Design a protein with these regions (language model features):
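Acidic/histidine-rich alpha-helical segments that form the ligand environment
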Residues: 29-40, 96-135
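Active-site rim elements
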Residues: 21-25, 107-112, 148-151
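Short, contiguous, pocket-lining structural segments
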Residues: 25-29, 114, 142, 153
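Short, contiguous, helix-prone interaction/anchoring segments in small proteins
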Residues: 21-56
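Short, contiguous alpha-helical
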Residues: 1-16, 50-94, 120-123, 135-171
């Protein structure tokens, strides 16, 4: 079981995401999230899924692609740091990734399947970690962060985006 990180294991800007993860079994919480996304967006038609709520905001499809990309990046960071790799990892510009991903050209079902697959890979990594590995840390985007904090960021980021999607779809 991966325990909740201490406040000194991550930069303050990650606190919002980590706070969205409830106490209890992190991995079980993470296992359920893809189904929550599916329940929210699976019945949308393509027009609904590509229409942003307001100009400059992301569409449902772009949000799904963003969740996948962010999870891959955070998972990669977790893998590197768990393996005691001390090489500093650069940050990424999420808006550039969203534009380059061209998620609006993909089907919603394809994006949901990708999310489930990415989450499965993340869970496999996290389930394999020893306590020592989960407590290791490294530098990403100029800030120190532990592997277990990254696990909580992954879950909390997905939860944050689920909440945004709920609001967006509620109108």
């Amino acid at each position: 079981m991966i325990s909740r990180p201490a406040d000194n294991e991550y930069a303050p800007f990650y606190a919002t995401y980590i706070s969205k993860v409830p106490d209890g079994d992190l991995l079980n919480f993470m296992e359920l999230q893809p189904d929550e996304f599916n329940g929210l967006v699976n019945d949308l038609n393509d027009e609904q899924a590509i229409e942003p709520p307001t100009p400059g905001k992301w569409s449902v499809k772009q949000m799904l692609g963003h969740v996948c990309d962010t999870e891959r990046i955070m998972g990669y960071r977790a893998l590197r740091f768990a393996r005691a790799d001390k090489t500093e990892i650069e940050g990424f510009e999420q808006d550039d990734y969203v534009v380059a991903a061209n998620s609006n050209a993909r089907s919603t079902s394809e994006l949901l399947a990708e999310l489930k697959s990415v989450r499965g890979a993340t869970l496999s990594l996290l389930e394999s970690l020893t306590t020592t590995e989960s407590e290791r840390s490294g530098i990403a985007n100029g800030k120190s962060i532990s592997v277990r904090a990254l696990a909580y960021v992954i879950a909390g980021h997905a939860q944050h985006d689920l909440e945004l999607l709920r609001k967006q779809l509620a109108g």
